[in-house]
Amino acid sequence: MDTKDSNSSQALAIDGGAQTRPTDDHASLTKRLTQPRSDRSQSPEGRPPPLPPRPETLILLEDGGAAPGTPRPNVSAVHPGLQSRATTAVSLAEISQNDRGKDALAVRSFPGTVRAKASLSHLATPKDGSDAGDSASVTSYVPYSESGDVENIFGSLASSEVGIAQEESTGLMQFPEFQADDVEDDFASELEPVGEIGEGGENEGTVLAYGSTTAETDQLIDLVLEKWKAKRKHYIILSAAGKPIWTRHGDGGLISTYVGIIQTIISSYEDSNDRLNGFTAGDTKFTVVAKGPLYLVAISRILESDTQLKLQLEALYMQILSTLTLPALTHLFSVRPSTDLKRPLQGSETLLSTLADSFTKGSPSTLLSALECLKIRKSHRQTINNTLLKTKVSKLLYGLVVAGGRLVSVVRPKKHSLHPGDLQLLFNMIFEAEAVKAGGGESWIPVCLPGFNSSGYLYIFFELQAMKNALVEKLEENGSINNIKEAIDKGRPSTTDIVPGSVLHHFVYKSRVNVQFIMSAYDPEFSTITRRRRLISTYNNLHASVHAKHTHVKVHHCVTQSSSSFAWITPVFELYCVAGPHANRNALAQSASKVVQWVQKEEERLFIISGAVF
């Protein structure tokens, strides 16, 4: 692939846990820390006394935060320069007491006030200090240890039974409960078409919006509207002038009235020099993202936070840019603010819909802002990498081997890598675009990757087709194609394959360094779309709470009537797991620790560490 700017013919190239231990005399320590360096050098003490020895284990989250009989140090004097006060508060009870007031409610109220740090527009490029909250927390990193130590570290995260609220004493997260959890509902119908209201409109033969008489027409329109209102989730894109551009359900005729209301509400805030980010009405959440001349709106009755909905809207915006590029989009609306964008986007509606449906069904990739890799032997992946390097051509910018929606290998320039959000767009195009399917897997349409360069297109030249053919031939000769097929057929590992007798039903592990994740098999507990959606909602809750702005402790545990869930965040990884509602807390913690140890052992099979670099 090569890339060219849309306004220029010039070719482009892609391119631990610090602790502060209080001494017996805080005043003396403060004096030594604040006096000038020259004065300290003249001190008769010569140098500050050594810190007290580090305890062998941390008994976190028990009442009082310390072992029985251990005197509690005075933590009232905290150095103002520290990133976090969690260095002296080693229990959720302590933190809750210290933060009681303006911060306590902010930490525990979901989903209105919790905020995650992730953004699709800055994937894999965290700002300096973005992990300060992790590195400054006592519980942000726990070395791999034996199961006996795990009980001390995690054992008292939750000491209450299901349904008993002991939020202040144990740190249990009070998440909303699912409705009708033990029965299958009609969630599968969420993705079915509702019909259209247009001249002779018909959506895949589902509903005709016009009858032979006025009464029949009104009846059909009412039926379409009822189906539209019954949907749990909507995505609507409109222009700043109030013109409908795209909606996941229905058509412009169906949503025109609602678009007018949305545009009026947003404009009223803008007239007051304010910006509307979202609001909640009953159990329905409205999230708004303004991108230049476009407004993107998500309306959801599914358990998701504002930040998660915002990430989804940003991904839809990137999908639009992949078709038009940012300069083209800006030019269209600068010339004519009332531009109808439906025609320029014609043909890409399917990509928008499939991307939106993946969010509705539940997308771990979007939630974690990471990519899933195919588990394969290290030697097999290295063979594929070497084959990519041997067959590459001079104009190659980036190459991918993808199987079953999971990344197998990449070939890339040294010190350059593609944006994970861009790779998600590529995956969506490869596996969902009708043009690619009709072309037997080939597409010559230029595509913009906004995370890399929102101003230009990537082009596929003829010589790259020759490279693809040569690569496939070599992969078949050395047996790599069969190795990939076997890895796909083997499927994701089950929790009991990794930890025999584990109480875990499912887990997701993200490598923060590699911006990649792996997860266990959905079967048998989450084999239906409804149960899978509830699983992702549980992960949504955990992710939002553990990444909340005022959260200090990075180990969270939640018990509801349907499940026990657990999150463990360190500077190295993020682990989210789910078990049954009556799972023993120590067994849950031990299983989580063993999963981390398994990932550490299998890391080069689970993740692409460097890929094929040239």
From Swiss-Prot:
GO cellular component: fungal-type vacuole membrane; Mon1-Ccz1 complex; multivesicular body membrane
GO biological process: autophagy; protein targeting to vacuole; vesicle-mediated transport
Pfam families in alphabetical order: Fuz_longin_1 (PF19036), Fuz_longin_2 (PF19037), Fuz_longin_3 (PF19038)
InterPro entries: FUZ/MON1/HPS1_longin_1, FUZ/MON1/HPS1_longin_2, FUZ/MON1/HPS1_longin_3, Mon1
Location(s) in or outside the cell: Endosome, Multivesicular body membrane; Prevacuolar compartment membrane; Vacuole membrane
Keyword terms of this UniProt record: Autophagy, Endosome, Membrane, Protein transport, Transport, Vacuole
S-adenosyl-L-methionine recorded as keyword: no
Record has Protease as a keyword: no
Membrane topology: Peripheral membrane protein
PANTHER family in UniProt: SAND PROTEIN-RELATED, VACUOLAR FUSION PROTEIN MON1 HOMOLOG
Record-stated family: Belongs to the MON1/SAND family.
Name of the protein this chain belongs to: Vacuolar fusion protein mon1
Organism from which the protein derives: Emericella nidulans (strain FGSC A4 / ATCC 38163 / CBS 112.46 / NRRL 194 / M139) (Aspergillus nidulans)
Lineage: Eukaryota, Fungi, Dikarya, Ascomycota, Pezizomycotina
Gene designation: mon1
